[in-house]
Curated annotation (Swiss-Prot):
Catalytically driven reaction(s): 2-hydroxychromene-2-carboxylate = (3E)-4-(2-hydroxyphenyl)-2-oxobut-3-enoate
Organism: Pseudomonas putida
Binding site for substrate: K43, N53, R54, Y84
Cofactor comment text: Glutathione seems to stabilize the enzyme, which loses activity rapidly in the absence of this compound.
Gene label: nahD
Protein name (database record): 2-hydroxychromene-2-carboxylate isomerase
Enzyme Commission number(s) from the entry: 5.99.1.4
Pathway of action: Aromatic compound metabolism; naphthalene degradation
UniProt binding sites for glutathione: S11, V168, W179, G180, N181, D182
Pfam families named among the record's database cross-references: DSBA
Family: Belongs to the GST superfamily. NadH family.
GO BP: glutathione metabolic process; naphthalene catabolic process
Cofactor(s) this protein cannot do without: glutathione
Active-site positions on this chain: S11
Length: 203
């Protein structure tokens, strides 16, 4: 069973969804296909050019409370970073190759940015990530500034737009789409139905 997961490291709701998806992967033997995308470009593509949540103080004040509720429910810390300049670490995702490496990178960066409140554009963050993942630091930093990395990021963002992704986190099971951390219980229900159908077919 494969779930496509679209995220941007600037999104606290993507951080929450990643935690829950990791648990679902263990429970259901789920394969997660990770896709780091440019949320700003995705929103512009559908005409969503209004102010972001962080520019709406009343809404942001509520969201901070709501996010802490979710974090407590999941048993994880949630600390707002100093900024949301996630482009570099989004691009860095495409340095990871195998599925296990991709999952490890996503977990390390999300935990740094939203678990510890480290700014995603902190100059030393790539070195920290490289050390935790056992990567060659200079090779990773070279990749971050390469045209090939930027092109891959742009291609994946365009592919998300073509698939009608309009926000993050977004998850697909087959052709069925769910948007939002609060839709994961619906995704899990669909996964359960699929498991039962497969069991019936094999019996």
């Amino acid at each position: 069973m494969i779930v496509d997961f679209y995220f941007d490291f600037l999104s606290p709701f993507s951080y929450l969804a990643n935690q829950r998806l990791s648990k679902l992967a263990q429970d259901y033997g789920l394969t997660i296909r990770y896709n780091a995308i440019d949320l700003a470009r995705v929103k512009i593509a559908i005409g969503n050019v209004g102010p972001s949540n962080r520019d709406l103080k009343v809404k942001l004040d509520y969201l901070k409370v709501d996010l802490q509720r979710w974090a407590q429910l999941y048993g994880i810390p949630l600390v707002f970073p100093a900024n949301y300049n996630s482009r570099r670490m989004n691009i860095g995702f495409y340095y990871s190759g195998a599925e296990a490496q991709a999952a490890a990178y996503v977990n390390v960066v999300f935990n740094a940015v939203w678990g510890e409140g480290i700014a995603p554009d902190l100059e030393s963050l790539p070195a920290l990530v490289s050390e935790k993942l056992g990567w060659d630091r200079s090779a990773f930093e070279h990749f971050l500034s390469s045209n090939a990395a930027t092109e891959r990021y742009d291609e994946q963002t365009h592919a998300a737009i073509e698939r009608k992704v309009f926000g993050v986190p977004t998850m697909f099971l087959g052709d069925e789409m769910w948007w939002g951390n609060d839709r994961l219980f619906m995704l899990e229900s669909a996964m359960g139905r699929l498991c039962r159908q497969n069991a019936d077919l094999s019996s």
